[in-house]
């Protein structure tokens, strides 16, 4: 994947996750970037991160809140699959629910960007177009326009 696209996608995913939680991370230097496809994919990935809730007493939450670089190490080692992407998104969302500090936010951004950079150049996020997804029409249009090229 193009590094610029991966960076924009990581920032947009974080912004969308935080927006869903009514948290503002613009003061940490994150702003919407990328083309309409990048923004549509980020919106969809942020919605996918909501599909699973991690229980509050899960030990990894405390560990990752105090050592966000561990998620970066995990992102560099995880195999690039849709399942692992969803797991990483759930972990990022869970950490952001507990800690939206500058350190944690940049740690989550670095982990997402590192994982997106490992995607193959021809990866087009076709899994977002499955029949069971009921995305808004303008999101579907942006996804279809880019994934079917």
UniProtKB/Swiss-Prot annotation:
Official protein name in the record: Non-structural protein 7b
UniProt organism field: Bat coronavirus HKU9 (BtCoV)
